Amino acid sequence: MASQQGLQERRRQRLRFQLRRKSGGRPRLSVFRSSKHIHAQIIDDAQGRTLASASTLEKTLRDAGKTGADVSAATVIGKLIAERGVAAGVKTVVFDRGSYLYHGRVKALAEAAREGGLSF
């Protein structure tokens, strides 16, 4: 039987393939969540470029003294990625939550991005 890491990699590739097939050429809003921080990127897979990104590791957010591991930080990142995406000319995206459940920080980021002007 395949190793656990190999199975996770296969699942990750399968999810990416499904997203690309259903995206219809729209950029992808990718979310990465760690135990201490959350990151979001708007990626154009056709060109292989990152159009906008936001993270709790950015200097302005770190200087505020807040942790990046809570729902309020995810909400700030969601609004920030939406603002930067709209500035880059992106209105519609495909939400790529990876293997994370649509709950908690991931849900807060998605809802804040919708409020900020992105549609998915």
UniProtKB/Swiss-Prot annotation:
Keywords, ordered alphabetically: Ribonucleoprotein, Ribosomal protein, RNA-binding, rRNA-binding
Record's keyword annotation contains Ribonucleoprotein: yes
InterPro entries, per database record: Ribosomal_uL18_bac-type, Ribosomal_uL18_bac/euk
Biological process, per Gene Ontology: translation
GO cellular component term of the entry, any: cytosolic large ribosomal subunit
Role description: This is one of the proteins that bind and probably mediate the attachment of the 5S RNA into the large ribosomal subunit, where it forms part of the central protuberance.
Record-given protein name: Large ribosomal subunit protein uL18
Organism: Gluconobacter oxydans (strain 621H) (Gluconobacter suboxydans)
Chain's gene name: rplR
